[in-house]
Amino acid sequence: MKALVKREASKGIWLEQVPVPTPGPNEVLIKLEKTAICGTDLHIYLWDEWSQRTITPGLTIGHEFVGRVAELGSAVTGYQVGQRVSAEGHIVCGHCRNCRGGRPHLCPNTVGIGVNVNGAFAEYMVMPASNLWPIPDQIPSELAAFFDPYGNAAHCALEFDVIGEDVLITGAGPIGIIAAGICKHIGARNVVVTDVNDFRLKLAADLGATRVVNVSKTSLKDVMADLHMEGFDVGLEMSGNPRAFNDMLDCMYHGGKIAMLGIMPRGAGCDWDKIIFKGLTVQGIYGRKMYETWYKMTQLVLSGFPLQKVLTHQLSIDEFQKGFDLMEEGKAGKVVLSWN
């Protein structure tokens, strides 16, 4: 079967022929229909410092997908061949304190598909049946293909109460853009998004952001003054940029709450005085709550949340290089690849 493989320890990704996997007793074989390129996939493509210490060459990458059940393991019940599914890309152990305590998203033994084990950029893949998420008929496959990052955005946006609150989002990648839309959809007062990429800031505005700020041209403090704000009640850090995070700390209202998804460089510092003397709460976010986040993000789309506005490109798998080029240049929202 075709698969996108990180063949070499250098920049690039390669379309290769690999064996079709065989599902174990509690697994399901999935025939992929559509997959989406994530920022993590771009890191692996670029072979940056994180990838070099994390990825073993020879890996089939990818973790954002939708497909149909092609074969059931001998012990699997509750699913049918031909059923359309996505899946939680974090495979957890099931026996640690957090898994047994109902907090599997905090499992210290988590294995990520497309990072630690072979992933979804292939014609077929296997997943534990317990990780599957059925996709309702009303949701098109091109949107279901990126439920994984949509779930990251939903986890962040729903971590704290944002109804009637002023929200600052640093980083207008697809996850930040979607999070901005969710915050407005559920009743935030002002949602301000910062970045230096005007293309992606426009997508955030299209999804409902009150103001988008190119911080290379405009002062965030000036925008706050225009909105008659003393500070932000909730911050969502999506950029992984230490300067953006410190700007957020500077602009938070006393007692504010911050959800952090962006991965900071090793050794990055911050102004601890702002966190301490403002009484800020900082919560790390990893993945999605299993499976409450999946339920809520599904219902958001079914209730009219315009997730389609962040989808900018649909390509065939043979055009994968164009997709990675668009992501590298910052000229895309979500890029979806078709395997049909």
From Swiss-Prot:
GO cellular component terms given for this protein: cytoplasm
Manner of cofactor binding, per the entry note: Binds 2 Zn(2+) ions per subunit.
Pfam families in the cross-refs: ADH_N (PF08240), ADH_zinc_N (PF00107)
Biological processes annotated in GO: L-threonine catabolic process to glycine
Name of the top EC class for this enzyme: oxidoreductase
Keywords carried by this UniProt record: Cytoplasm, Metal-binding, NAD, Oxidoreductase, Zinc
Active site per database record: 40, 43
Positions contributing to Zn(2+) 1 binding: 38, 63-64
Gene Ontology molecular functions: L-threonine 3-dehydrogenase activity; zinc ion binding
Homology family: Belongs to the zinc-containing alcohol dehydrogenase family.
Subunit description: Homotetramer.
Function field: Catalyzes the NAD(+)-dependent oxidation of L-threonine to 2-amino-3-ketobutyrate.
Name of this protein: L-threonine 3-dehydrogenase
Species this chain originates from: Xanthomonas campestris pv. campestris (strain ATCC 33913 / DSM 3586 / NCPPB 528 / LMG 568 / P 25)
Biological classification of the source: Bacteria, Pseudomonadati, Pseudomonadota, Gammaproteobacteria, Lysobacterales
Gene behind the chain: tdh
